[in-house]
Amino acid sequence: MEGKNQTNISEFLLLGFSSWQQQQVLLFALFLCLYLTGLFGNLLILLAIGSDHCLHTPMYFFLANLSLVDLCLPSATVPKMLLNIQTQTQTISYPGCLAQMYFCMMFANMDNFLLTVMAYDRYVAICHPLHYSTIMALRLCASLVAAPWVIAILNPLLHTLMMAHLHFCSDNVIHHFFCDINSLLPLSCSDTSLNQLSVLATVGLIFVVPSVCILVSYILIVSAVMKVPSAQGKLKAFSTCGSHLALVILFYGAITGVYMSPLSNHSTEKDSAASVIFMVVAPVLNPFIYSLRNNELKGTLKKTLSRPGAVAHACNPSTLGGRGGWIMRSGDRDHPG
């Protein structure tokens, strides 16, 4: 460690998918399509929820936050990757790398928390429908979103500050398409055991615990659905919850493969593929699985888009914050399955 030359590295090289030289145009088109699809889908959800006061209920409040996060998560990595492919450059500045690492961790953490909150919301709606409005009150809904935002902001800040105190040697090549913490740690000349321990602790507390909560929520949901006498009702509930659970398994499975295994067992190709799943693919699928399959939301979208000035109205802060706005009418509408 100490014998290596410690130099002040001003930039890193993101190799990304550079080994796929013959497929660079295809990769550019693929990631651009995925990014724009996710961007458009999540913006549509925000537009619909922001423009219709009838959708200012707990479920759609959580959906709006999820859509916002799913706009930001791929935006922290994909534009830079597309720029590097287009310009045939692979550099990213040292401050830019740390900033990218921070925002990726922050939005991934928040995505994880929101999936957990939405699983709980679904559990209350299905298992305690008569008490839904009482349980999912304004104060609880606000706390279920505010507390995760605080944790999601502060936790990656700790990792970023710890990373900023490490020394880096002449090796500045990152075998990834973004500045992932597990790709940066092996490049350091300093002792990174504390950093690795903090990563494992973070994954254990911020990802494993919520995933267990989600699993328990869905077990209770399945148990409640099995008591429904109508076969059609069971099929509808299982169809909806099954697609949600599949996405959750995809999200957590990818994160577990990247962050729960020791650094020595990491494979560049596997890490990149797994990261694409939870950084790019999941945010694209979320709008379709959680929202665009919802007839109520699709109906609102059609009415909103056909109305002049709909976008300006939806983006007006007063639309979301007036009296009787967010979450205040949680009992006015049935919770969509």
Swiss-Prot record:
Q: Could you tell me which residue ranges are on the Cytoplasmic side of the membrane?
A: 50-57, 121-139, 220-236, 293-337
Q: List all topological domains (Extracellular).
A: 1-25, 80-100, 159-196, 260-272
Look up the record and report any one GO term of the cellular component aspect: plasma membrane
Q: How does it sit in the membrane?
A: Multi-pass membrane protein
Protein localization: Cell membrane
Q: List the disulfide bonds.
A: C97-C189
GO molecular function, a single term: olfactory receptor activity
Residues bearing glycans: N5, N8, N265
- What are the transmembrane regions? 26-49, 58-79, 101-120, 140-158, 197-219, 237-259, 273-292
Which SUPFAM superfamilies does the record match to this protein?
A: Family A G protein-coupled receptor-like
Q: What protein family does this chain belong to?
A: Belongs to the G-protein coupled receptor 1 family.
Protein name, as recorded: Putative olfactory receptor 1F12P
Q: Organism, per UniProt?
A: Homo sapiens
Which gene carries the instructions for this protein?
Answer: OR1F12P
